[in-house]
Amino acid sequence: VVPILPLFDLDILHTTVSGLEKHIAAFIEHKNYTNIHLLGNSLGGHVALVYILKHPERVKSLTLTGSSGLFENAMGDSYPKRGDYEYIKNKTAQTFYDPAVATPELVDEVFEITKNRIKVIKIIALAKSAIRHNLGEELNQIQQPTLLIWGKNDIVTPPFVAEEFKKLIPNSQLHFIDKCGHAPMMEVPVEFNSILEKFLGSLSK
């Protein structure tokens, strides 16, 4: 089940990591899901961390990949620059090890978002919220088995971030994937799924 995060649908006051977590919590409550295997990438990982800290009784395992919550490089300088297609194209490509993963369709989608002033304001609000909402001092409370899958070439949440998550989350294991950036599930789906399936399989034994 992949719930859509309402990145642009919440009012500006609730366009935060906590606001997104409340949305996910309400969805899980509505569906009455328990024994959840929770997985999140980037900001989604941050939301998953806040959720598991608030509702540990509902979660069986946690998988993070390129997660914010400790450190993130945001998108650097003055992102997002509105109306500069080449800039957006380059920034989108930097998310991945292989720039070809940033297809014209994906770049067009990002570019359309950056042309919308309200959406840009909400992206900036979420980025600032993620930086403020550092979870370093709370991660030792997570007792569930945790899988960390990280691209060795991630420049948004670099490998040292994964090492820090590994150090702070007690029952965690870390797998680096070579020649991979910030989105392993998109860049190397076969390897990503293989690591994930092995982890989930070990929990059912």
Description of each model-found segment:
Residues 1-39, 194:
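Active-site loop/oxyanion-hole signature of alpha/beta-hydrolase fold enzymes
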Residues 5-9, 69, 181-184:
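Alpha/beta-hydrolase active-site loop signature
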